[in-house]
């Protein structure tokens, strides 16, 4: 199975930019490509989905068994799978490699392209590259330099060859495709004006400065991943309503697919369009950025009332992140204005100015 992983030295080095550039370039070449994200990330897969026009998937070595990781990789792969890493290559749970990009590359036996941000560096970038290559046994095969000039790339490419790595190109500083930050790391793809134009511009830069042909060559991995196929039994005949729009868009594609494979009919509705909850046996309110649309959500009383009636009638409800905020009496928007919400949960919720908790957490039920 053809596959390649794009990893980074650290968060913010340009992994997502490079990944989207490569994905769009492959799509423009009419290649059937599928994309994956290492770890529990909703936002980066939405960028991938915007680029390739199909679902993007998560591979999480902390939450999944090795079998499940390789099963889902094989199940969802096209002619080539492009896997984007998370944080720095070796960064995992609680100062270990558990859940890290490195661990995923080992489990899936995938060749790795390391993205290095050269802003403020020239030759020092190679000390970083050499350190990553020699720190642990790994599958790092090539390097792409971000924020680098063409002149300096010639020197760095020679240095790469000296330590046995393939120089795969670079991206200059491209101001026209800057992706601004949000409180979870990146804005959602749907919030960026002219996103497809930006992605195609990235692809043009990739074709000019990145060796796409060599990436395809490296991806020709004849090492089969080992796994036991998961047997999924269709044993339910239920209808599950899922809030799905710009405000509620944080879902793992494989979770929804699994529910369908087990017999559930997934029916999506939009709180932003004031759609009522359809008749259902279960309700899912996913995460997102509802505080950006709090004024609209407050005005859409049809949805508010139907969600309240649904939950109060005893229909099981899973609400997380923004969906959990939506169930409260009051939600504070980005400008600290208060808006009335569903009211099932007493109290007010708001977004703080900084992350309160980030990463995995393990809990044990007391009852």
Where are these regions (language model features)?
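ATP-dependent carboxylate-amine ligase catalytic core
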Residues: 2-17, 23-108, 116-139, 150-154
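Phosphate-binding active sites in nucleotide-utilizing proteins
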Residues: 238-301, 305-310
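Hydrophobic/aromatic ligand-binding patch that stacks against planar heteroaromatic rings
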Residues: 25, 103-104, 159, 258, ...
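Cysteine-nucleophile active-site neighborhood
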Residues: 290-366
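A short, charged/proline- and glycine-enriched loop
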Residues: 1-2, 233-239
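Beta-strand->loop->alpha-helix junctions that form or flank phosphate-binding loops
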Residues: 37, 164-175, 265-272
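A short helix->loop->beta-strand "cap" motif at the edges of active sites that frequently abuts
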Residues: 110, 165, 312-316
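Internal gly/pro-rich beta-alpha loop/helix module
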Residues: 123-231
């Amino acid at each position: 199975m053809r596959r390649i992983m794009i990893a980074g030295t650290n968060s913010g080095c340009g992994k997502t930019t490079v990944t989207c550039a490569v994905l769009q370039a492959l799509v423009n070449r009419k290649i059937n490509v599928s994309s994956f994200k290492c770890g529990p990330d909703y936002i980066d897969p939405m960028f991938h989905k915007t680029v390739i026009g199909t679902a993007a998937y998560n591979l999480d070595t902390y939450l999944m068994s090795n079998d499940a990781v390789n099963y889902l990789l094989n199940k969802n792969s096209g002619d080539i799978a492009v896997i984007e890493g998370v944080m720095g290559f070796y960064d995992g749970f609680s100062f270990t490699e558990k859940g890290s990009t490195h661990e995923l590359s080992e489990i899936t036996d995938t060749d790795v392209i390391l993205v290095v941000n050269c802003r403020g560096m020239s030759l020092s970038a190679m000390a970083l590259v050499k350190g990553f290559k020699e720190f642990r046994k790994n599958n790092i095969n090539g390097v792409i330099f971000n924020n680098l000039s063409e002149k300096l790339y010639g020197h760095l490419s020679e240095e790469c060859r000296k330590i046995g790595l393939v120089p795969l190109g670079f991206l200059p500083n491209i101001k026209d495709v800057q992706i601004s930050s949000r409180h979870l790391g990146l804005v959602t793809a749907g919030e960026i004006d002219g996103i497809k134009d930006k992605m195609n511009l990235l692809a043009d830069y990739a074709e000019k400065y990145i060796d796409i042909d060599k990436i395809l060559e490296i991806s020709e991995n004849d090492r089969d991943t080992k796994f036991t196929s998961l047997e999924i039994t269709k044993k339910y005949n239920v209808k599950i309503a899922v809030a799905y729009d710009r405000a509620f868009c944080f879902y793992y594609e494989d979770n929804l697919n699994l529910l369908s494979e087990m017999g559930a009919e997934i029916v999506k509705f939009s709180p932003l369009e004031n759609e009522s909850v359809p008749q259902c046996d279960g309700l899912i309110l996913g995460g997102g950025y509802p505080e950006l649309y709090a004024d609209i959500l407050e005005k859409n009383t049809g949805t508010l009332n139907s969600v309240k009636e649904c939950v109060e009638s005893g229909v099981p409800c899973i609400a997380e992140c923004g969906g959990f905020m939506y169930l409260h009496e009051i939600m504070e928007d980005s400008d600290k204005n208060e808006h009335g919400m569903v009211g099932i949960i007493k109290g007010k919720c708001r977004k703080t100015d900084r992350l309160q908790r980030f990463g995995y957490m393990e809990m044990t039920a007391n009852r």
